[in-house]
Amino acid sequence: MKFEAVYSNTTIDPPGTIPFIRDNYPEVKIVNPKESFLQLVARKGFPSRQRRFCCEVLKESYGVGKRNLEGMRRDESNNRAGYEPEQCDSRKSMKGACHVLPLVFWTERQIWEYIHKHNLPYMKYYDPPYNFTRHGCVGCPLATKQQMRIEFKTFPRYAINLVKAIKKFMETHPETFWGKNFDNGHEAFYYYINDLSLQDFKFMKTASMFKNDFRRMVNNYLGINE
């Protein structure tokens, strides 16, 4: 069966991802986007679970109108628990694309047994000292806030660049949620990675519970001096 193995470069996967693919799986075609993730944030703001424009632009666009084999599994999350081995995409933008999921019933244990049995190379981030359970976009909004914080703390330079991108968006879009409710990029980023309602955030800020030095708070958390 002829197939084309593709990696969509989201520009925000963990460092070393592309060299790893080139060294170990040279047959994989690396597709680069027209806009990077940071450029998208600077133009559209932070993504969210309900507003995943980053997935549409950076991950799914290559599969429009095609039959795609993907590695998603039911036991990865509650959202994927109802996935079928094959399902067609009803979104107009995907133009009838079909998603074939050959591993949909596999467990995590079966995945690792297969990897070790066949001695398949995999990224170092699954092993100590990282111990990641997933390899994907750093700070993905589909992950928990706790996972987002862990990933940004592991890769602090990504976080700093994201602060700069949202700052640019806020300056050019002052009428939006991020532009209206936050004073600077560090403040917006702090809210983005924490489990706080906007009401609670504003109350805590008014009460000076944050001491309102979000740049210092973010940098201290990330362990950097800037």
Whereabouts are the PLM-identified features?
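ATP-dependent adenylation/nucleotidyltransferase module used to activate substrates
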Residues: 1-117, 224-226
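ATP/NTP-dependent adenylation/nucleotidyl-transfer catalytic domains that generate, transfer
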Residues: 121-123, 127-226
